[in-house]
Amino acid sequence: MKSNADLQKDVQEAIKWEPLLSVAEIGVTAKDGVITLTGTVDSYWKKTEAEEAAKNVAGVKAVVEKIEIKFANNSFKKDDNDIAREVLTAYQWNVEVPRDKVKVKVEKGWVTLEGELEWNFQKEAAKDAVRDLLGVVGVTNNIKIKADTQDEIERKDIETALERNWSLSDREINVKVSGTKVTLTGKVDSWYQKTEAGRIAWKAPGVWSVENDLVVDYAYELAD
């Protein structure tokens, strides 16, 4: 059981624990399990790291991210064409991103990714390769998953994989399969568990989409 103040402190400590993040840069407020992050950082990577750190704190049901990016000096500001070239170069060195499968658009530092890939881990790798680049202020990942395999998705295999995971073994997660789509419903204790369940479902052969409708239902106590 956590109060708003306790949850706020835990999130602040989680952010502080990240070596390149500073609590002084990021403001944290907590209300009924919803965390709001504000402040200014000098890279997109820091922005996403702060959000991930907050999501993984026990008791967090949702994160509202309002962090702004302001580069420390003009040397970090890059032309959109330069950013696009750096993204494509990053993909050439990344074995998880199939060559010439991802289309890149850059507008005022905001990168949009499009195309079709076979696996979700490839889609995530494409996004992760971009977030570390200087000059990037945001990423929209519109890559679609279209697996080549024609295997029928086995609901039981996904359920077994979820039960094998130490953080999910005692959770009641319902799995529904409709064609190439998997839907997860039920309740979990943390944002981490919700994300982990979705990641596991994506690994099933033949999956084109995962609708993660799991509800984070943490026992929450308001402060007096």
Which positions does each model-derived feature cover?
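N-terminal targeting leaders
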Residues: 1-224
